Amino acid sequence: MKLLEIYDKQLVEQEEGGFRAILTRYLNKWIFTVDHKLIGTMYITFSIFAGIIGTLLSLVIPMELSTGNMLEGDSQQYNVIVTAHGLIMIFFVVMYCSMPAMLGGFANWFLPIMVGAPDVAFPRLNNISLWLIVVSFGLLLTSSCVGIGAGTGWTVYPPLSMMEYHPGHAVDVGILSLHIAGASSLVGAINFLTTVFNMKIAGLSWPKVSLFVWSVVITAVLLVLSLPVLAGGLTMLITDRNFETTFFDPIGGGDPILYQHLFHPEVYILILPGFGIISIIISRYSNKGIFGVKGMISAMSAIGFLGFLVWAYHHMYTVGLDVDTRAYFTAATMIIAIPTGIKIFSWLATLWGGVIKITTPMLFVIGFLVLFTIGGLTGVVLANGGLDISLHDTYYVVAHFHYVLSMGAIFAIFAGYYYYYAIMNSNRILGIVRYNEQLGRIHFWTMFIGVNVTFFPMHFLGLAGMPRRIGDYPDAYIGWNLIASYGSLITAFGLLFFFVNIFTPYFKKKALISKKFQRGAMILMGLDFSRDWQIGFQDPATPIMEGIIDLHNYIFFYLIVVAVFIGWVMGRILWRFAYKWSYPTIGDIEIFKNFTAYNQIIHGTVIEIVWTLIPTVILYLIAIPSFTLLYAMDEIINPTVTIKIIGHQWYWSYEYGDNSSNLVEFDSYMVYERDLNEGQLRLLEVDNSMIVPVKTHIRLIITSGDVLHSWAVPSFGIKVDAVPGRLNQIGLYVKREGTFYGQCSELCGVDHGFMPIKVEAVKVQEYLGRLYK
């Protein structure tokens, strides 16, 4: 009582000191604080603020895509919004609320407590890390408002990010923002590593350390090793822009693909901390210890190690890597699915036989398991170097990425926030603050439905060949885009319940909703889709595309079996073992366990080996046809016709062997823009129409005269990046006549959202006649 009286006396003296004393008190408490709990609270508050801005930007994107034309502005403005949304959600929400809500929010709050430390090792560095990220966020918002804005995409790939295509200082400010964000992450990672290794209490052995602490340690190690590489890549990029260096400029001997090797998307860094939170909540609400703790630690360590070996995963298969390199990345990416599968099965084994209590955090955990599993299965699809040729840079990739992050990391964030809500928000003045359970469940169900309605149709758009990062597209894609737009509104509506739920206890202690939550049915209106643009690939016109479709169906046979098995296990867990007593006693739990017909899965080495063998065998069965197709696609059999494709003007040059085996050269200017019917093809450059002979082996040589392009014709199974300074080649054999459409599907540095490509496949005689004509 004496300490409290002294504290109250100090508060009275400060209040009597006037405005200056009050200002000093608040500055010392919030701005200059070294208290790890206050810093953790400010990290989470900042992440919520950044999440609001990122979510508002994300709502603009589906609204733009709800119609086939640009609603307002041009494609540059659309790309600026896409870039800002991606950078904010990756670096300031997921990274600083999922990862440093392990290295920012949750970790600051609970990691010192879990290892028995009074605070972090370097409290002042902890404060610097927080305010660096705030400054970085301000610079990022500024970059979207300076000049034409930074419309490079969140990966900031050159040459599009070079001064020629993004003049002004918008990209420079964005690069500086990422530099400062990296410094903040690096400082935080070093701080937590030092805290765990130097301040862990003596009696706490490593096997007994919380899985959350393990996830933070592994993530921090990844950050310490990867962020300097990212900083080096950004430094080279900004010197290319301002100091005439040529690290990424082929004119001076550089290579724009080098940047893609350096700027590896840190997906594994982002998702690992969420694993720790999920493990804690599953253990708490199933009334069991986590199954196979050592196996879980080993799985996270393996994911962290393998994450450094798969940097070309799914986004570099088309840049011109040789076939052996692509085969390596295919194998390495499949292998990383094994420890991930071990974690999923171990979580299910923990739930199996447990006394489960369904609460809001547990609902988000179950949602995480379902949605992260879907994202992982589509990740196995994209890991295949042959199959990814058709799916690269389409909305299939967008769907996969968001299922892993928007529904993986973000659901883990919500689960952790609800789980620790009372601990983080209770104090002397307010007492114990609790969220409203019914509002939390409404938040979960609306968001769960919303994100699935938003992102699941994107798989179908990707299979049909719709490219990402465009604001304009053919009308054939409008149906699924419209459904995705409705889903984004449902998700935003669900987030309103979250904000009402977390802020209401500060103003009103009684529950807002007194009636029992009733589930509603959602009716989706059917839309009239053309058969060719529904839920599958476009009709194949080449053996390669037929092989891609066969491989896709083969892979999905196994993945559907896995998904059905996991779904059956989760259904049995929730149906048979759901325990609805609010406050079960130990005796009740023992009676319940003895009453059930199923025995609990005990901790043992045999079952952990089974968990490892199941994904290993399935991936081995998938790898055999995958490698067969990959090497078959690389073969170019005695090409009769060689076609060189040069972007950005899409100029075609032809070489055809005549009867004397001499090469006859032709150019592509056969169909001029003035000769096309009005409205036939939108946003033309010089010429985007070419002809090819059917049943003839063709070699395509693709390069670019300016920025990166992605030249794609879905019916051919072709998607090749046109890179300045590189000659990428691919074989082609068209089996049937017809007119096929493709697209340039990357950010090309020009004011267009969708550049269509028209390819006519005709008989050899007609082909030669049109060339000579």
From Swiss-Prot:
Mg(2+) binds at H392, D393. SUPFAM superfamilies: Cupredoxins (SSF49503), Cytochrome c oxidase subunit I-like (SSF81442), Cytochrome c oxidase subunit II-like, transmembrane region (SSF81464). GO terms for biological process: electron transport coupled proton transport; mitochondrial electron transport, cytochrome c to oxygen. Fe(II)-heme a binds at H85, H402. It catalyses: 4 Fe(II)-[cytochrome c] + O2 + 8 H(+)(in) = 4 Fe(III)-[cytochrome c] + 2 H2O + 4 H(+)(out). Residues 1-491 are annotated as: COX1. Disulfide bonds: none annotated. Ca(2+) binds at E64. It comes from Dictyostelium citrinum (Slime mold). The chain crosses the membrane at residues 41-61, 87-111, 130-150, 173-193, 211-231, 262-278, 290-310, 335-355, 362-382, 396-416, 444-464, 483-503, 555-575, 604-624. Heme a3 binds at H400. One of its GO terms (molecular function) is cytochrome-c oxidase activity. This is Cytochrome c oxidase subunit 1+2. It comes from the Eukaryota. Its cofactor is heme; Cu cation. It is a multi-pass membrane protein.
